[in-house]
């Protein structure tokens, strides 16, 4: 009998690019940007032309994974489309990429460092007007 580890499916390898490479891919190569932060985080500032599909929701019990995440992404992107995925620090977006790759999305890239690194580099963002 073959060892059981030979039958395990290893998770797809997530390709992570730094924020400078991500900016180039979005600005010059025309890749679309998927922001997986919460709607509240996204509303405080985001990359221009980004699409927001939260990977997690904040509930009274803490963070809970969005059960419709892959379905919602599939309504916005084709499985062949090249997409840069980002969050606040690069952790949720990496998990999101794992789920998307497992669902058959072929060309997703994680933005390492996330929105925080984007801001640290002084790259352009869309900040909604503050009320009050």
Say what each PLM segment does.
Residues 1-31, 39-84, 91-132:
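Rhodanese-like catalytic fold shared by cysteine-dependent sulfurtransferases
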